[in-house]
Curated annotation (Swiss-Prot):
Entry-linked Gene3D superfamilies: 3.30.70.3600, DnaJ domain (1.10.287.110)
Name this protein carries in UniProt: DnaJ-like protein MG200 homolog
An example Gene Ontology molecular-function term: unfolded protein binding
One GO cellular component, as annotated: cytoplasm
Length: 910
């Protein structure tokens, strides 16, 4: 699919209403920028072509009209060849020179004259590279044989028959130039093999390297082919490749290589496919091989089998060379004393035996040392020697890490086992030997073997004589059989009695269940768990405390008075009896909710709290109280604020002030006109305005020109309505109209009765505050409305028409000459309304522009002044348009406000 063309106006960067001058300027600018001689970008030529095409169409009125009407289709039919004047001439010239319409019965072997099409502009032509390629391909092989022939003519009869000559040239012209490739193969191959052999095997013996280099001459092919597959001269390896056991020397004699097992070649050695001497590569013994040689239990078979079968799963085979290889000096195969002390199983067992032997001597019982037999000791010695060989190959850092690990293991074995006080005379201890495993040079012991096998895995609880002396000793009541602890019993009974005393108060009962620390602090004391005492008196009996749930604390934001880290002080009192009435002391801080507790609901809404029997009942009661509280209408104490100002209006007004400031600076004025005086910011509120029931305040910024014309201002807002029966809140959109007054200079305030929010107890009042945005060019003073006009100095001297601005629109006035700067002109009955039938005066202040006009053109400063004043007129018309749209959208008669609402409009006095 052809690529879509760009819009011509977009190419030149113009709009569709551009004139011829704009087209010429844009074309010259872009042509200089993208001309291929100046711009070396790869797409400069294409862009330059688009610029030429766009200029050709848009500069022609007829083509431009067709393009604007039909697009590219309107100019493609006639514009494709409009860029070349001689396109058709060159086209017919090509047909004539090609001889396409000559005698067609003649042979097609006539050579056509190749004439290069002239490349014109950037839209027509033929690639020169393509022509040169086709010419070279056609004549490259016959130029040498056609030198004696005359130049060809334009007629078919003069073309000679060159087929015979071409065959002669092919046979004789290059016969002597073909080199003998086979003659130079021997010496080239010998040199390559010699060089590659010296690079691949740099560390072999000198005699073997010389023998390899001299054997690079290739024998006859028949000798090699006859011996392939003969097991006497070679073998197939696991990969299926044939490996030779020898080679032919230069004299053609077979030379045997050193006999080695083919499969013993290491996987790490590198071989090449082109060389037949891979089997002769020497094998070096590594550090691991030397260790295997010292401890290898099985000999290595080096006999060469007659025929080697490929293995399905090859395994690495350690091979040894015929010459001994010295071990590296850095490897020291000597056991270190630290490893012997930590890794020896005999000594580790001895540390355990020593503990058991002391008790065995006291009871005259055989110890573990006597039960170990000689074969087991020999096994331990062999294992120790194997560990020493293994750790000798480790790095120093790894050995130190091993020592630390095993040292920790020994310490855990010696100190983690508690002393047993079981009578050894009853049962004989039989200690099993610890089993050990070796992995990567480390020895691991199974410590479960140190447990006495004949004992119960869960021993009985020790007697009171064996417990810690620091712990309190509980006493046992012989009559009841219950165990009591004096200190803990006092603390528990104190808390229980305090709860019993507070249970009569429902609020205290709820607070009690919301305190998690009363039951958790005692549990955290480092004391043994003892059963709680119970009171048998039915009147003073208290239900057990339920478990604390985190839900109520998170829901109602209760904070416990006692933190979890505090300890409850205990007081020594006598235990309670069945008939004794105890008065508990205040042993804990009082349980009181913090400031974040639930606010007290209204008396009528929340029922009286009953005595909760369980913790769940108390939680349900609080949830129900919170639910009722949430359903009640919330009456805010502060009226809600609504700002109806359009944010874009304030942004545009700031830009407007910045432009006027710059213009006044050019006129050698201050930031405002001299007659514009800043009014005092004071507010006089009508005492008849009652703001007691106001619950909604609407605020909006309005331009002063709307006040000067006493327009209606549309107020739109949304109020809330709460149904007292269902407690459902709905909203209602209201539109009001406020009559503005030209006397308001800072703000206007009006109160509308019953147009505020309704929270279920009746509608509140609405307060409307309209703040005035001061005008830049208009100000209302005591004598009338003042404004300004900018006059060109020549017009002020000679006289003429000037633009004068009134409160509604601008008009032209013909003035006489001789007007001085800052002169004042009064226009009667053109100001603002004084009464319903009479208007005030309009005072116009005339100022000179700082520059004079040139010729018949308009003064630039006067035009800028005119545009800035009309910005305020646009704001006035925007407000009128909003009112017109609202009135047009009304389908029914609008409900008018009562007269009292309009009479409540507050205005400022002068």
């Amino acid at each position: 699919m052809a690529e879509a063309k760009r819009d011509y106006y977009e190419v030149l960067g113009l709009s569709r209403d551009a004139d011829d001058n704009d087209i010429k300027k844009a074309f010259r600018k872009l042509a200089k920028k993208y001309h291929p001689d100046r711009n070396k970008a790869p797409d400069a030529a294409q862009i330059f072509a688009e610029i030429n095409e766009a200029n050709d169409v848009l500069s022609n009125p007829k083509k431009r009209a067709n393009y604007d009407k039909y697009g590219h289709d309107g100019v493609d039919n006639e514009g494709g060849f409009a860029f070349q004047a001689d396109v058709f001439d060159s086209f017919f010239e090509e047909i004539e020179k090609s001889g396409a319409f000559d005698n067609l019965s003649e042979s097609n072997t006539k050579k056509k004259e190749k004439t290069k099409t002239k490349k014109k502009g950037w839209f027509w032509g033929k690639s020169k590279q393509e022509e040169s390629t086709s010419d070279t391909t056609e004549y490259a092989d016959v130029d040498a044989g056609l030198e004696d022939y005359p130049p060809q003519s334009d007629y078919p009869d003069d073309i000679p028959d060159v087929d015979a000559r071409i065959e002669e040239v092919d046979q004789s012209a290059y016969a002597d130039d073909i080199p003998d490739v086979d003659a130079g193969m021997d010496w080239e191959q010998n040199a390559e093999v010699a060089n590659s052999a010296s690079e691949i095997i740099p560390d072999v013996d000198a005699g073997l390297a010389d023998e390899f280099n001299t054997s690079s001459a290739a024998p006859q092919a028949s000798d090699w082919e006859a011996m392939i597959g003969n097991p006497e001269y070679g073998y197939f390896d696991a990969a299926g490749e044939w490996n030779w056991k020898g080679f032919f020397d230069e004299a053609g004699q077979w030379v045997w290589l050193e006999e080695t097992e083919p499969s013993s070649v290491s996987n790490d050695e590198t071989t090449t496919d082109s060389d037949a001497v891979t089997a002769a590569t020497t094998v070096e013994e590594t550090d691991q091989d030397s260790w295997t040689a010292n401890s290898a239990p099985e000999p290595v078979d080096v006999e060469t089998p007659v025929e080697l079968q490929p293995e399905t799963e090859p395994e690495p085979i350690i091979t040894l060379s015929s010459e001994p290889v010295e071990a590296p000096a850095s490897v020291v195969i000597e056991p270190t004393p630290e490893i012997e002390e930590t890794t020896s199983a005999v000594e580790m067992d001895a540390s355990v035996k020593a503990d058991v032997s002391d008790e065995a001597d006291a009871t005259n019982e055989p110890t573990e040392q006597d039960t170990i037999s000689e074969p087991e000791q020999e096994t331990d010695a062999a294992a120790l020697e194997e560990i020493n060989h293994t750790t000798a190959d480790l790095e120093p850092a790894e050995v130190s890490a091993t020592n630390d690990l095993e040292q920790d293991v020994v310490e855990k074995v010696n100190f983690s086992e508690p002393e047993s006080t079981v009578d050894t005379a009853a049962t004989d201890p039989v200690v099993e030997q610890a089993t050990e495993t070796s992995t990567n040079g480390f020895k691991f012991f199974n410590f479960s073997s140190f447990v006495l096998s004949d004992q119960n895995p869960n021993p009985q609880t020790p007697t009171h004589h064996e417990e810690d002396a620091a712990a309190p000793e509980p006493t046992v009541d012989e009559t009841s059989g219950e165990s009591t602890a004096p200190e803990v019993t006092i603390a528990e009974s104190t808390v229980e009695l305090e709860t019993a005393a507070e249970i009569n108060n429902p609020a205290t009962f709820v607070e009690e269940y919301l305190q998690p620390t009363k039951t958790t602090v005692v549990d955290k004391l480092d004391e043994p768990t003892v059963a709680k005492p119970t009171v048998s008196d039915s009147e003073n009996s208290v239900a057990p405390e339920p478990e604390f749930v985190a839900g109520p604390e998170q829901t109602f934001s209760w904070k416990p008075a006692i933190s979890e880290t505090e300890e409850i002080p205990l007081t020594a009192v006598e235990p309670a009896s069945e008939t004794q009435t105890l008065i508990a002391e205040d042993v804990t801080s009082p349980v009181t909710p913090t400031a974040t507790a639930i606010p007290a609901p209204s008396i009528n809404a929340v029922p009286t709290a009953p005595v909760a029997e369980t913790f769940e009942a108390a939680v349900d009661f609080l949830k129900e109280a919170a639910k009722i509280e949430a359903q009640l209408p919330l009456v805010p104490t502060v009226p809600e604020q609504i700002d109806g100002t359009d944010p874009s209006l304030l942004t545009q007004w700031d830009e407007y002030l910045e432009k006027t400031r710059k213009l006044f600076h050019k006129l050698f004025l201050t930031e405002q006109l001299p007659f514009i005086v800043k009014t005092d910011q004071f507010e006089i509120v009508d005492p008849n305005l009652d703001e007691h029931n106001v619950n909604l305040i609407y605020t909006e910024h309005v331009p002063q020109i709307c006040f000067l014309n006493e327009q209606l201002k549309e107020i739109r807002y949304t109020r809330k309505l709460v149904d007292p029966q269902t407690q459902v809140t709905t909203t209602e959109s209201i539109t009001l109209e406020v009559q503005l007054s030209h006397k308001s200079q800072t703000e206007a305030i009006a109160i509308f009765k019953g147009f505020g929010h309704d929270y279920g107890s009746g509608c509140g009042d609405l307060k409307v505050v309209l703040k005035v945005i001061p005008s830049v060019f208009f100000q209302l003073q005591a004598d009338g409305l003042h404004t300004a006009a900018l006059v060109d100095p020549l017009v002020a001297y000679n006289g003429g028409l000037i633009d004068v601005f009134g409160p509604v629109n601008s008009f032209k006035v013909d003035i006489e000459g001789g007007i001085a700067n800052n002169d004042l002109i009064e226009f009667n009955q053109l100001g603002v309304l004084r009464t319903k039938t009479k208007r005030g005066s309009l005072y116009v202040h005339l100022y000179y522009s700082s520059v004079a006009k040139k010729g018949t053109k308009t003064n630039c400063q006067v035009q800028q002044f005119f545009d800035l004043v009309h910005v305020e007129y646009k704001l006035l018309n925007y407000n009128l348009k909003q009112l017109h749209n609202y009135h047009s959208a009304l389908t029914a008669q609008k409900k008018t406000l009562d007269r009292k609402s309009y009479q409540c409009l507050a205005v400022e006095s002068h």
